[in-house]
Swiss-Prot record:
GO CC annotation, single: extracellular space
Protein name per its UniProtKB record: Somatolactin
Pfam families xref list: Hormone_1 (PF00103)
UniProt KW Disulfide bond keyword: yes
Domain of life: Eukaryota
Lineage: Eukaryota, Metazoa, Chordata, Craniata, Vertebrata
GO molecular-function terms, A-Z: growth hormone activity; growth hormone receptor binding
Glycosylation sites: 145
Any one Gene Ontology BP term: positive regulation of receptor signaling pathway via JAK-STAT
Keywords: Disulfide bond, Glycoprotein, Hormone, Secreted, Signal
Cystine pairs: 29-39, 89-205, 222-230
Places the protein is found: Secreted
Length: 231
C-alpha cells in the first residue's frame, strides 16, 4: 500500500469517524434504577435488528483498528507469527461451534449464548488493550479512539444480547457469568516486541470473533424469517 493511499484512507477515516460514533442506535434498555428491563416497548424482531447493527459496526471498526495497527507497528515478517501456538486466541477454549455442521445443529438460544460468551470474554481484554496502546509513543488518536469505542459498544451489545435471550426464553432474570473463566492472562512487563505481538494477536483475534458474532446473529435472523433456507 503506497503512502498516498494510506493518507487518503486516513482522511476519509477522520471525516467519517464522528458520524460512526453517533450513527448506531443505542442498545441500552434500562429502567430508572439502572437495571435491565424487559424492554416492553420494542419487539424481539426490532431488538435483534439493533443487536445485528451493533455487531456489524463493531466488526467493521475492529477490522479498521487491526489494519491500522498492522500498518504502523508490525513488520511484514512478523505478521504470520500470530498464528503460531504462542499466540493462540484467548477464546479458543470456549465451547463455540466452528464448523458449518455444528452451527446448523445448535438451537437459536445456543446461538445467542455463543454470542454472549464471545462478547463477555472480550470485555476485559479490550480494557487492557486501551491501557497498553496508550503507552505506545506514536499510537495515533484514531486507533485509541476506535479501541475505546469498540470497548464501550461491546458492553452495549452484551446488554442487548442478554435482553434478547430473556425475551426468547421469557425469563424474568438472566445474568452474565461467562466472564469468570479468566481466559485472559496478563504478563507484568513484556518487552516491546512481545507487547506488540500480543496486542496484534488480541486485535486480530477480536476481529475474527467479532465476525463470528455478526454471522451468528444474522443466522438467527435468517432462521426467524426463512427457516429452511439458512446456510
Amino acid at each position: 500500500m503506497n503512502m498516498m493511499t494510506v493518507k487518503q484512507q486516513g482522511v476519509w477515516a477522520a471525516l467519517l469517524w464522528p458520524y460512526l460514533l453517533t450513527a448506531s442506535i443505542p442498545l441500552d434498555c434500562k429502567e430508572e434504577q439502572g437495571s435491565l428491563s424487559r424492554c416492553p416497548s420494542i419487539s424481539q424482531e426490532k431488538l435483534l435488528d439493533r443487536v445485528i447493527q451493533h455487531a456489524e459496526l463493531i466488526y467493521r471498526v475492529s477490522e479498521e483498528s487491526c489494519s491500522m495497527f498492522e500498518e504502523m507497528f508490525v513488520p511484514f515478517p512478523l505478521r504470520l507469527q500470530r498464528n503460531q501456538a504462542g499466540y493462540a486466541c484467548i477464546t479458543k477454549a470456549l465451547p463455540i461451534p466452528s464448523s458449518k455442521s455444528e452451527i446448523q445443529q445448535i438451537s437459536d438460544t445456543w446461538l445467542l449464548h455463543s454470542v454472549l460468551m464471545l462478547v463477555q470474554s472480550w470485555i476485559e481484554p479490550l480494557v487492557y488493550l486501551q491501557t497498553t496502546l496508550d503507552r505506545y509513543d506514536n499510537a495515533p488518536d484514531m486507533l485509541l479512539n476506535k479501541t475505546k469505542w469498540v470497548s464501550d459498544k461491546l458492553i452495549s451489545l452484551e446488554q442487548g444480547v442478554v435482553v434478547l435471550i430473556r425475551k426468547m426464553l421469557d425469563e424474568g432474570m438472566l445474568t452474565a457469568t461467562y466472564n469468570e473463566q479468566g481466559l485472559f492472562q496478563y504478563d507484568a512487563q513484556p518487552d516491546m516486541l512481545e507487547s506488540v505481538m500480543r496486542d496484534y494477536t488480541l486485535l486480530s483475534c477480536f476481529k475474527k470473533d467479532a465476525h463470528k458474532m455478526e454471522i451468528f446473529l444474522k443466522l438467527l435472523k435468517c432462521r426467524q424469517t426463512d427457516k429452511y433456507n439458512c446456510a
